[in-house]
Amino acid sequence: MVSSALRQFITDAAWGELDYLLLDLPPGTGDVHLTLAQIVPLTGAIIVTTPQDVAKADVIKSIAMFQLPQVNIPIIGIVENMSYFIPADMPNKKYYIFGQGAGEQLAKEYQLTLLAQLPIEPSVAQRSDTGVPAVMGNDSVAQTYQDLAQTVARYIAIKNEQVLSNKNN
């Protein structure tokens, strides 16, 4: 049912010309992921994890699925969400509430890029509730999201250049 809705969402919407289309999928390797890989020419996947060990199992399955020859979707990198918390009244203190280093460990183990470690930050939820993206702002959290966006945009630009170069040769 979800795969059918995704197929309809992708194929029936009048998207127009897009620079980027980001899809936030549930963790794992289910029908949704495979359907998407079959119906859309994907530039790449960003694997999002959290620091907990239990999250690593899903991430490992996702990495393996995207690397299957019949799927073969490049992995742009890993983002570790909820990496740490910095209290407003103690800006020099970091708390690793859910553990530490899972994103780095996975990136190293699978020779992937660790794109970002996103903090637990109440202002992100507050901004979202008012319709303001987390990337907007002048604080370190906004800068982290801006850096992530720029890294992904650079990766996609390089990939697109490679595709054009291969077509011209």
Language-model-detected regions and their locations in the chain:
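Glycine- and other small-residue-rich loops at beta-strand/loop junctions that grip anionic moieties
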Residues: L25, V48, Y95
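Short amphipathic alpha-helical segments
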Residues: L34-A37, V59-I60, M90-P91
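Short coil/turn connectors at secondary-structure junctions
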Residues: G16-D19, P41-G44, I73-P74, Y110-L112
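Alpha-helical scaffold segments in soluble metabolic enzymes
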Residues: S4-F9, T35, K61, M65, ...
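Conserved active-site and cofactor/substrate-binding residues in soluble primary-metabolism enzymes
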Residues: M1-S4, D31, V40, V54-A57, ...
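C-terminal lobe/tail of nucleotide-utilizing enzymes
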Residues: Q67-N169
